[in-house]
Amino acid sequence: MADKKSPLIAVSVGEASGDLLGAHLIRAIRKRCPQARFVGIGGELMKAEGFESLYDQERLAVRGFVEVVRRLPEILRIRRGLVRDLLSLKPDVFVGIDAPDFNLGVAERLKRSGIPTVHYVSPSVWAWRRERVGKIVHQVNRVLCLFPMEPQLYLDAGGRAEFVGHPMAQLMPLEDDRETARKTLGVDAGIPVFALLPGSRVSEIDYMAPVFFQTALLLLKRYPAARFLLPAATEATKRRLAEILQRSEFAGLPLTVTDRQSETVCRAADAVLVTSGTATLEVALCKRPMVISYKISPLTYAYVKRKIKVPHVGLPNILLGKEAVPELLQHDAVPEKLAAALADWYEHPDKVAALQQDFRVLHLLLKKDTADLAARAVLEEAGC
């Protein structure tokens, strides 16, 4: 273990959303403990904060049951290596951010060796596989929850958990500012603008981007002046998007791919087509109407459909307790249906205004000083 004035904090993330949380956490910890050091698995944003990544985070960014099975030997090899490295380094605390199937296994092994463990972002145990709660309580010392309905599940099982709010709700302004967003991106104020968010992982891009681009072509026929914006989450996804856009069917599509800037892109848009996941919450906090879509391998879909315990898959719909925005999944994730649903938002501003009121209420519910609350909990577990 390190000197408590300069604790060694191990962190592991599996995808772009976890990288963002990790970067904010590092910053907040450094405000309280400037000499803290960070090591583990992280992405580009965490590295920019001085994080030492022992393995390539992109290698863990895999979705779906079938896709995970294909990459399982490599993922297990990375996990074994990370456990071995951290047992040698003896960090003061281990923080697994999201990616529960990977990080909870690491946490369990480290906890058995006396290293305090924290899991930041509860798995969706309220949606499916609720039986995991008891196991998670044994794997980690503490769970930091982003949604208010989560802590009680762990407390009822004898664990320690707390609601720290959602970092996006803290960081993003309550008020809308479409004009500034469009100026920033060089987009005309008077034209139809649609944002496309096909996912943060290369595997998601492979499934969703072609469908989203075909949807954009249909919208372009309906609105010839339309522009399309797509924020690339990582360099790897940007490269894959460029490869897909080289197909002849997408020639001439008025699409701008940005380096990240997802919030600015969403604020500039009239409506957003988004892959199910954390990005749906970001769109809601931007107060933008959206259509949620997702498409995975048939085997993965059949497995998930049997296990899911909630009527919706999109976070805004789950948190609001109703289908506030359309969800077009799997067989319904076709360009014709997606384009029609986006056009419905664009052509009905009264519906958009009502939705924005719902999203404002949701924003206020989730708004806390998340990074600082998480930093305080992590340092407490580290004995600082």
Curated annotation (Swiss-Prot):
Catalytic activity field: a lipid X + a UDP-2-N,3-O-bis[(3R)-3-hydroxyacyl]-alpha-D-glucosamine = a lipid A disaccharide + UDP + H(+)
Domain of life of the native organism: Bacteria
Enzyme Commission (EC) number: 2.4.1.182
Pathway listed: Bacterial outer membrane biogenesis; LPS lipid A biosynthesis
InterPro entries per record: Glyco_trans_19 (IPR003835)
Glycosyltransferase among keywords: yes
SUPFAM superfamilies: UDP-Glycosyltransferase/glycogen phosphorylase
EC category: transferase
GO molecular function, one term: lipid-A-disaccharide synthase activity
Signal peptide: none
Any GO BP annotation: lipid A biosynthetic process
Function: Condensation of UDP-2,3-diacylglucosamine and 2,3-diacylglucosamine-1-phosphate to form lipid A disaccharide, a precursor of lipid A, a phosphorylated glycolipid that anchors the lipopolysaccharide to the outer membrane of the cell.
Entry similarity comment: Belongs to the LpxB family.
NCBIfam families reported for this sequence: lpxB
Record's protein name: Lipid-A-disaccharide synthase
Name of the coding gene: lpxB
